[in-house]
Amino acid sequence: MSRVAKAPVSIPAGVEVTLNEQTLTVKGAKGSLTRVINNAVNVVIEDGVIKFLPVEGAVGAWAQAGTTRALVNNMVVGVSQGFERKLKLVGVGYRAKLVGADIDLTLGFSHPLVHKLPAGVTAECPSQTDIVLRGVDKQLIGQVAAEIRGYRPPEPYKGKGVRYDDEEVRRKEAKKK
């Protein structure tokens, strides 16, 4: 039985939640998000809270209710406050700059990499070695950050590469002769 599903999601002021059949739409100051709800979960919107109840007899219904509750909570937080992910470039000559809606990355390859940002994600480069991604969809922000990090993940010997701002890179000692 999911403990997560038992906690209702409160709807803050300025956020509008509508349920049409199995489609949940959340609109707020930062934008709007839509998600199709699993058939094993019943969603009830009343008195400024969203409750999630499993369908009787459905296999894994409590687990789906907990997952749905977490996803909807991320939608509500995203449209009201937004999400942000910071990346740091560590290495000699590693640079990032914004070119329109693209990020131009110099990561030690023989050519610069151009990463196109999807709709719903905005980027900012406060310095040449920092990237800040912002948006309303938490999953999309994490996906874009993982794609950029995937170009040059941090290596354990010198720590060079693209890393999340809060990431601790485990360092290894060089081989001794």
UniProtKB/Swiss-Prot annotation:
One GO BP: cytoplasmic translation
Instruction: State whether keyword RNA-binding applies.
Output: yes
Q: Does the keyword Nucleotide-binding apply?
A: no
Q: Which GO terms describe its molecular function?
A: rRNA binding; structural constituent of ribosome
Q: Write down the superkingdom of origin.
A: Bacteria
Q: Which InterPro entries match?
A: Ribosomal_uL6-like, Ribosomal_uL6-like_a/b-dom_sf, Ribosomal_uL6_a/b-dom, Ribosomal_uL6_bac-type, Ribosomal_uL6_CS
Q: Where is the composition biased (Basic and acidic residues)?
A: 152-171
Which UniProt keywords are listed? Answer: Ribonucleoprotein, Ribosomal protein, RNA-binding, rRNA-binding
Gene3D superfamilies assigned to the protein according to its UniProt record, in alphabetical order? Ribosomal protein L6, alpha-beta domain
Can you cite an annotated GO cellular component? cytosolic large ribosomal subunit
Q: Which Pfam families match?
A: Ribosomal_L6
Region entry Disordered, spans? 152-177
The residues that cross the membrane are: none
Family listed: Belongs to the universal ribosomal protein uL6 family.
Q: Which PANTHER family does this UniProt record tie to the protein?
A: 60S/50S RIBOSOMAL PROTEIN L6/L9, LARGE RIBOSOMAL SUBUNIT PROTEIN UL6M
Assembly and oligomerization: Part of the 50S ribosomal subunit.
Q: What does this protein do?
A: This protein binds to the 23S rRNA, and is important in its secondary structure. It is located near the subunit interface in the base of the L7/L12 stalk, and near the tRNA binding site of the peptidyltransferase center.
Please state what the protein is called: Large ribosomal subunit protein uL6
Q: Which gene encodes it?
A: rplF
